[in-house]
Regions:
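Alpha-helical transmembrane segments of multi-pass membrane transport proteins
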Residues: 60-61, 116, 129, 147
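Helical mechanochemical/support elements of P-loop NTPase systems and associated helical scaffolds
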Residues: 16, 20, 43, 47, ...
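Hydrophobic transmembrane alpha-helical segments of multi-pass transport and channel proteins
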Residues: 93-100, 114-115, 130-132, 158-169
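Amphipathic alpha-helical segments that mediate coupling or scaffolding at interfaces
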Residues: 27-30, 54, 90-93, 108-111, ...
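Alpha-helical transmembrane segments and their immediate interhelical loop/hinge regions
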Residues: 2-109, 119-120
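Canonical bilayer-spanning transmembrane alpha-helix
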Residues: 72-91, 123, 139-176
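Membrane-interface alpha-helices
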Residues: 107-121, 125, 175-176
Length: 176
């Protein structure tokens, strides 16, 4: 029920986006005045840019991961390389648990063909995840946010320690 209500709410926001923006600006202008309104709009614009760039970085990282997974699986001559590589890339958009979902689905599919191929896939994906998580992700997302990779890793670790998965997602663009 809450999912349905969320979809309805989102749909209504999208339909009346321009009206909602105009009404929100009028309300903020009346409450804050000219000077504070200009500062508030600057902060909102900066946050919008940061979150937009973060999402673009996440999508870029997912495409890179999916492509590397597909290429590696083809080189290892594993079955379903294109399908599983695409799936792993899409699952990379889900913070923390996404890679595990991709690995589990791929392992189950390959296990039905050969347990050895499933193990080979898991080892390859584990190594790829290490490279992706420690090198590719900080560089890709960091470059979109104009933030050094070290700060991206620090934001993920601190955010995760303070707020769990949601902190990992929110702290990177907030750090920028």
């Amino acid at each position: 029920l809450s999912l349905l209500m969320s979809l309805i709410f989102t749909f209504n926001i999208l339909i009346g986006k321009e009206t909602l923006q105009r009404q929100s600006r009028n309300l903020l202008h009346r409450v804050l005045g000219d000077t504070r309104m200009a500062r508030a709009m600057h902060v909102i614009s900066t946050l919008d840019d940061c979150f937009h760039n973060y999402i673009v970085g996440q999508c870029t990282e997912a495409v890179i991961l999916g492509t590397l997974c597909t290429i590696g699986m083809m080189l290892l001559r594993l079955d379903y390389a294109l399908m599983l590589g695409t799936f792993v890339g899409m699952m990379a958009l889900i913070p923390i648990i996404g890679p595990y979902i991709g690995a589990a689905v791929g392992c189950i599919m390959l296990f039905s063909i050969s347990p050895a191929k499933a193990l080979e896939f898991l080892i390859y994906l584990f190594l790829l995840q290490q490279v992706e998580g420690n090198l590719i992700y900080p560089h890709t997302v960091g470059s979109k946010l104009k933030l050094p990779g070290l700060w991206v890793l620090a934001a993920v670790l601190i955010g995760g320690g303070m707020m769990g998965i949601s902190g990992m997602v929110l702290f990177v663009p907030l750090t920028a």
